[in-house]
Amino acid sequence: MAFSRESALDVAKVLSESLPYIQRFAGKTLVIKYGGNAMTDENLQAGFARDIVLMKAIGINPIVVHGGGPQIGDMLAKLNIESKFINGMRVTDTATMDVVEMVLGGQVNKEIVNLICEAGGKAIGITGKDSRFIKAKKLFVKHQAEGMTAPEQVDIGHVGEVASVDTSFLKFFENSDLIPVIAPIGVDDEGNSYNINADLVAGKVAEAVGAEKLMLLTNISGVQDKQGNVLTGLSTAQVDALIADGTIYGGMLPKISCALSAVNAGVTSAHIIDGRVPHATLLEIFTDTGVGTLISNTKVGE
């Protein structure tokens, strides 16, 4: 690739300015939840893969966790398997779980692995069933149907939450040149498979390995105040206040809960990142401004 002198100087300046960040994060583990537009736009896909390879090359240990809800929905439709949702969660019987495993652990996972390998990295695709490193337990949801006086606990099938994470399995990758790409499928002691929310898996993996950062890629610009302004830096106490006054609500709550849990468990910072921005992960790591909202135990300005 040919550069003009001016362009070459700009590149050199960027590389030089990134040195303090490289020194700070070398040897650290970053857990990145990959989803949203970043997973469906070809240019963003290629950029994400290169960014992950770059992290590994400079000594950062990235762990990628991915979702795949739309792809699961598409495959179920092709197979004429009807999807039913309760409180936004897919009811997952045995037949549906077979499709979930096929799509998440096969199609989507291997597409991401291939992207990273094409960018020059050495990625390996795994699910929580490999070495049973993600133990799961069944998730029951509270649901109040029309006419009911109180909510009831509903069994929605093979949908779970993380019971534990075997860190020794993940440490193997940290000490190698392999980049783990995790499909969010867990397993219980009886060998039953469970589909787990990818944000939740990313958060619990970050907690278990003592990650420096948890990064959740989304299709929004970050956490916003009631006027629509992006809040670039928040303490956990400030986030609690924003939840209490209704600023943070709805679909953002599960992501924020994962981020809060991770930070409260010792992860240095969690980031809600705009995955629609090219190279969003690098911008969040190697610049002061970033492209989303940083959540930590420190108030902004301290």
From Swiss-Prot:
Record keywords: Amino-acid biosynthesis, Arginine biosynthesis, ATP-binding, Cytoplasm, Kinase, Nucleotide-binding, Transferase
Binding site for substrate: 68-69, 90, 195
Enzyme category, top tier: transferase
Major subcellular location class: cytoplasm
Protein's pathway: Amino-acid biosynthesis; L-arginine biosynthesis; N(2)-acetyl-L-ornithine from L-glutamate: step 2/4
GO CC, alphabetical: cytoplasm
Site note Transition state stabilizer, residues: 33, 255
Recorded GO MF terms: acetylglutamate kinase activity; ATP binding
The EC number(s) this enzyme carries: 2.7.2.8
Catalytically driven reaction(s): N-acetyl-L-glutamate + ATP = N-acetyl-L-glutamyl 5-phosphate + ADP
Keyword presence, Ribonucleoprotein: no
GO annotation terms (biological process): arginine biosynthetic process via ornithine; L-arginine biosynthetic process
Claim: Amino-acid biosynthesis is one of the keywords in the record: yes
Gene3D superfamilies to which the protein is assigned, alphabetical: Acetylglutamate kinase-like (3.40.1160.10)
Family, as annotated: Belongs to the acetylglutamate kinase family. ArgB subfamily.
Record function comment: Catalyzes the ATP-dependent phosphorylation of N-acetyl-L-glutamate.
Protein's name in the database: Acetylglutamate kinase
Source organism (scientific name): Marinomonas sp. (strain MWYL1)
Gene name tied to this protein: argB
